[in-house]
Amino acid sequence: MQEAGRMQLGPAPIPTTNTISDKKTIAIGADHGGYEMKTALIEYIRELGYEVFDCGTSGKEAVDYPDFALAVAEQVISGRAWRGIMIDGAGIGSCMVANKVPGIRAAMAYDYASAANSREHNNANYLTLGAGLIGINQAKLIVKTWLTTEFGGGRHQKRVDKIMGVEKRFLKEG
């Protein structure tokens, strides 16, 4: 796994396809609270036909979610992963971390509707889940919905462009 602190922030291309392989790769990570759910989801995501890149953690020992949320985001913005999924206790903290990374549009989903909306309306490329808030069956439904829902474009594209404009406006070179 890459060290999270080595990432250079700056304008990054937003990949629309996987640049390493024709098969779509999903980067996935978790803290200790999401480890068991991550393990189950890796198998499920592979069953759906995707490649999986595991960004850690590798056990239930207490770790800091920002490190793993950033590692997943790095895979997405570099183009090594098509999309990213991060699981922590509530899904909120990891979503906040990921949305600090230029080019990431992270959404926390807790049901079918929020997963579909995040893709169709907001073109989210990063999903966060709260292992303490949802069970594995709900998580599988959310992940499948999120991975298979296409961006709606049209009137939503203008709004996503505005999100990107806000990002550019406040982006500071490091």
Predicted segments — roles?
Residues E36-M37, V63, G93, N137:
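Residues that form or flank phosphate/diphosphate-binding pockets in enzymes
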Residues Q2-P13, S21-G29, G33-G34, Y112-G174:
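C-terminal binding/interaction regions
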Residues E51-A62:
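A short beta-strand-loop structural module common to alpha/beta enzyme folds
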Residues E43, L70, E74, M96, ...:
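Alpha-helical segments flanking ligand/cofactor-binding loops in enzyme cores
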